[in-house]
Curated annotation (Swiss-Prot):
InterPro entries associated with the record: ATP-synt_VA_C, ATPase_F1/V1/A1_a/bsu_N, ATPase_F1/V1/A1_a/bsu_nucl-bd, P-loop_NTPase, V-ATPase_su_B/beta
Organism from which the protein derives: Borreliella burgdorferi (strain ATCC 35210 / DSM 4680 / CIP 102532 / B31) (Borrelia burgdorferi)
Function of the molecule: Produces ATP from ADP in the presence of a proton gradient across the membrane. The V-type beta chain is a regulatory subunit.
Membrane spanning stretches: none
Key word Cell inner membrane present: no
Sorted UniProt keywords: ATP synthesis, Hydrogen ion transport, Ion transport, Transport
CDD domains per record: ATP-synt_V_A-type_beta_N, V_A-ATPase_B
GO molecular function annotation: ATP binding; proton-transporting ATP synthase activity, rotational mechanism
Similarity comment: family membership: Belongs to the ATPase alpha/beta chains family.
UniProt name for this protein: V-type ATP synthase beta chain
Length: 434
């Protein structure tokens, strides 16, 4: 069967169309231009008309260039040699190291059989009180970090990568600025975590369509390590860039647009990636944290809106902090009853009092007279924000719970907190005054 063709029917954006026979959906090809060559993937079959997206872009490609079909979908090498390495969205080395061609696995396979999944039951400690105490990250959970441009979401991912108690970190970067890419690399290297990390990075300077492979290649490698018993945390940034690349291809293919120009299968495409999160019985697990930027801080934007229906909660990053209102880990109840007996009480009581303090903050801003209770709430608000919400805080869960008691005792009497007497007697600091 003929596998090499030398006539391109049309070129539209990063998509080329050729007439070919015996080609499979998702099959890879090499487009050989005059001075370079680039990988391409079959994204549409219409009888003998085959459409391919060219990962390196179509700049310099002419209709007389050669297309060689490879007979397989995209593959990536899998072994422990991946650890500490940095690759692009196609699995090629970005760090100047050698190419890895052994033990190739195909990417983008189906999600694991639901019968192989076990109920989430283990906490992933991050050292961040706003996660560990108030919205616990659970092994095999899938959670987005909703944010706007300019917030330190990549810095948050770096903190989690350095501090999370997992075996392996896989970073999938889509549309990363070169400075952000270097920050990730340098921070993990200085923190001693690069040796347990694997990077698949698409930068803003790369072809847009190459970002489409980053989640699939990251999650395929994660799945193989999880089956070997590793606890894997996959950090993806930014899923909105991923969706925008899908939108660009959809427009090029002249597909009927859906909400705000995004393809009609946006939900399915996002769900397909997030559903890779799993805890394998008798093996390891995959946990997914994915940054999703909200254009104009609009949570009804199609990308965050669809994401919210797929994931098990979300973290909101506002003002450089994880916002306690709106952030939610729907699986936290699976684990925080088994951490310490005061965990849920501290979580509920501190958030309730912090919500009350917001009214006192508004009263002060509007010039109203402040009661003694208002003054206590204002003091509490300041302590809570500086000692609990600040992303620079790095303390174990037990120390964070003790800190919560200390903050409460510094601002209130035991009766004012509404906490049960047995917990007050067990944990209330003896030397604090209010």
């Amino acid at each position: 069967m003929k596998r090499v063709y030398s006539k391109i029917e049309s070129i539209a954006g990063n998509v080329i169309t050729v007439t070919a026979q015996g080609i499979k959906y998702g099959e890879l090809a090499i487009v050989k231009a005059k001075d370079t060559s680039s990988l391409a993937e079959v994204i549409k079959l219409d009888r003998e008309k085959v459409s391919l997206q060219v990962y390196g872009g179509t700049r310099g490609v002419s209709t007389s260039d050669e297309i060689k079909f490879l007979g397989h979908s995209m593959q990536v090498s899998f072994s422990d040699n991946l650890l500490g390495r940095i690759f692009d969205g196609s699995g090629n080395p970005r760090d100047g190291g050698p190419s890895l061609d052994d033990n190739l696995i195909e990417i983008g396979g189906p999600s694991a059989n639901p019968t192989k999944r076990i109920v989430p039951r283990n906490m992933i400690r991050t050292g961040l009180p706003m996660i560990d105490v108030f919205n616990t990250l659970v092994e095999s959970q899938k959670l987005p970090i909703f944010s706007v441009s300019g917030e330190p979401y990549n810095e948050l991912l770096i903190r989690i990568a350095l501090q999370a108690e997992v075996d392996l970190i896989i970073l999938g970067g889509m549309g990363l600025k070169h400075d952000d890419y270097l920050t990730f690399k340098d921070s993990l290297e200085k923190g001693g975590a690069l040796s347990r990390a694997i990077f698949f990075v698409h930068t803003a300077n790369d072809s847009v369509v190459e970002s489409l492979t980053v989640p699939d290649i990251s999650l395929s490698v994660a799945e193989k390590f999880a089956l070997k018993g590793k606890k894997v945390l996959v950090l993806l940034t930014d899923m909105t860039n991923f969706a925008d690349a899908m939108k660009e291809i959809s427009i090029t293919m002249e597909q009927v647009p859906s909400n705000r120009g995004y393809p009609g299968d946006l939900y399915s495409q996002l769900a397909y990636r997030y559903e890779k999160a799993i805890d394998f019985e008798g093996a390891g697990s995959i946990t997914i944290l994915a940054v999703t930027t909200m254009p104009g801080d609009d949570v009804t934007h199609p990308v965050p809106d669809n994401t919210g229906y797929i994931t098990e909660g979300q973290y909101y990053l506002k003002g450089g902090r994880i916002e306690p209102f709106g952030s939610l880990s729907r699986l936290k109840q699976m684990v925080n009853s088994r951490t310490r007996d005061d965990h849920r009480t501290i979580m509920d009581s501190m958030i309730k009092l912090y919500a009350s303090s917001k009214e006192s903050v508004e009263k002060k801003a509007m010039g109203f007279n402040m009661t003694k209770w208002d003054e206590k709430l204002l003091k509490y608000s300041n302590m809570f924000e500086s000692k609990m919400m600040d992303l620079s805080v790095n303390i174990p869960l037990e120390e964070a719970l003790d800190l919560g008691w200390s903050i409460l005792a510094s601002c209130f009497s035991p009766k004012e907190t509404g906490i049960k007497t047995d917990l007050i007697e067990k944990y209330w600091p003896k030397k604090e005054t209010y």
